[in-house]
């Protein structure tokens, strides 16, 4: 039995709204709670990740910190995942140049 059948929606088209980037800011978390969306994904290195509560939350994989603020740091000691200031690299090109597979895993 697939998810839609378990929800009593078998054979129907449905729209599932998913709140992305939870944990990045307090405002993101507040919007998620206020809107009551059914699903979301948490950016665990985000400064507000511990404030996210929900039953159907996934993990948003974070390996870059592309915005000037807020910047995010790796939760591990992986040096190849850090820029000179200790944050994730700003973009994919910088990540690919430096990242070591064993630290990404």
Q: What are the residue ranges of the model-derived segments?
A:
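Acidic (Asp/Glu)-rich catalytic clusters
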Residues: 7-8, 30-36, 49-58, 73-76, ...
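Active-site gating loops and adjacent loop-to-helix segments of metal-dependent hydrolytic enzymes
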Residues: 68-100
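N-terminal pre-catalytic segment of deacetylase/amide-hydrolase enzymes
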Residues: 1-15
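Active-site mouth loops of central-metabolism enzymes
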Residues: 14-25, 93-104
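N-terminal start-of-domain structural block
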Residues: 17-42
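Structural preference for beta-strand elements that scaffold enzyme active sites
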Residues: 14-16, 37-41, 54-60
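Histidine/acidic residue-rich metal-binding segments in metalloenzymes
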Residues: 53, 104-105
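Acidic-and-aromatic substrate-binding clefts and catalytic sites of carbohydrate-active enzymes
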Residues: 22-26, 42-52, 64-68
């Amino acid at each position: 039995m697939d998810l839609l059948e378990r929800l009593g929606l078998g054979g129907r088209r449905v729209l599932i709204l998913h709140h992305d980037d939870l944990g990045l800011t307090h405002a993101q978390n507040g919007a998620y709670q206020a809107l009551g969306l059914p699903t979301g994904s948490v950016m665990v290195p985000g400064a507000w990740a511990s404030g996210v509560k929900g039953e159907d939350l996934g993990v948003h994989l974070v390996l870059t910190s592309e915005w000037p603020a807020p910047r995010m740091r790796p939760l591990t000691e992986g040096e190849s995942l850090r820029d000179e200031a200790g944050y994730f690299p700003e973009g994919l090109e910088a990540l690919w140049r430096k990242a070591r597979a064993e630290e990404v895993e």
